[in-house]
Amino acid sequence: MSNGIVIIGSGFAARQLVKNIRKQDATIPLTLIAADSIDEYNKPDLSHVISQGQRADDLTRQTAGEFAGQFNLRLFPHTWVTDIDAEAHVVKSQNNQWQYDKLVLATGASAFVPPVPGRELMLTLNSQQEYRACETQLRDARRVLIVGGGLIGSELAMDFCRAGKAVTLIDNAASILASLMPPEVSSRLQHRLTEMGVHLLLKSQLQGLEKTDSGILATLDHQRSIEVDAVIAATGLRPETALARRAGLTINRGVCVDSYLQTSNADIYALGDCAEINGQVLPFLQPIQLSGMVLAKNLLGNNTPLKLPAMLVKIKTPELPLHLAGETQRQDLRWQINTERQGMVARGVDDADQLRAFVVSEDRMKEAFVLLKTLPV
């Protein structure tokens, strides 16, 4: 490989891939291009920065220069890739271009901001860069509106509440975590958030935002409104696919790849939040770790398929943490819920009484690994 491997992106997926390649090959040319600084930080920490009193710069674990030195690669930070010429094997930015033998897209996903009037007033916390842009406003805010009651919205609501802020969480659904589990399972966390003082506006819709002299006026359905100091969009992520689309790659929800992480072009691969693996978008740490291990082998000449085991998803709400696994969103499961003071175990079984999913909380989380072994893969 005279031109080596070019990676676009610098998040967890890109870094896992670099580390796995270097475990197997110390000399193959590696080039990493990204729009950000390429400094390393732990993205899940963004759900806890306010209660921890952390500034954006406090999150940095390793500088770009240290990363380049440790893993022998060329870095191009603050660089927007504009085009990929797949036929010529060339990646282009406004001022530069790079030849590649193999190309990897690790472009991540961007926060979805609901298309309502005043949407430009909404903040997002999907990267260190985004937090840096709004950290002063968030630290100073007394009243915070979080739009979206999913995993990230629930984590942020608890964190801001622990920091002493007045928190309102709004969602169209009738319960929090509605896309992950049924209400009878999420109700324990929902009750805890309410106990802590989070004002839940469920089955409610944000209709618009407007700047006022004393804050931001949020207009809701049913002729309601509230005034806050900051509004955060936590309404999910959208895989970054524009670059892949322009390159002529197959796109669905994400950049479509097979079990080998290969796109519709034989020399272009994708992993992480931007990838759709055999129809599944899996924006969680464990599948990304496993993808990085497999893709490193395949880029170096192997032909190893990705095989994903049953995997845990962790909801980092410290006052009532949850682990879940399996097909928790399936509508046809019967849920057997065992609740005690020290925690909950909820088992989702099918018509044949086969365990298909589970959710565990607090001290009962230690039972997760035993349950995980009984889930079908």
UniProtKB/Swiss-Prot annotation:
Listed EC numbers: 1.18.1.-
> What domain of life does the UniProt record list for this protein's source?
Bacteria
Q: What is this protein called?
A: Nitric oxide reductase FlRd-NAD(+) reductase
One Pfam annotation reads Pyr_redox_2
Where primarily located?
cytoplasm
Among Gene3D superfamilies, the record links this protein to: 3.30.390.120, FAD/NAD(P)-binding domain (3.50.50.60)
Q: Where in the cell is it found?
A: Cytoplasm
Query: What cofactor(s) does the depicted protein rely on?
Result: FAD
Function noted in UniProt: One of at least two accessory proteins for anaerobic nitric oxide (NO) reductase. Reduces the rubredoxin moiety of NO reductase.
GO MF: oxidoreductase activity, acting on iron-sulfur proteins as donors, NAD or NADP as acceptor
The entry's keywords: Cytoplasm, FAD, Flavoprotein, NAD, Oxidoreductase
The chemistry this enzyme catalyses reads: 2 reduced [nitric oxide reductase rubredoxin domain] + NAD(+) + H(+) = 2 oxidized [nitric oxide reductase rubredoxin domain] + NADH
Q: Which gene encodes it?
A: norW
GO cellular component terms?
cytoplasm
Pathway info: Nitrogen metabolism; nitric oxide reduction
What does the sequence similarity comment in the record state about its family? Belongs to the FAD-dependent oxidoreductase family.
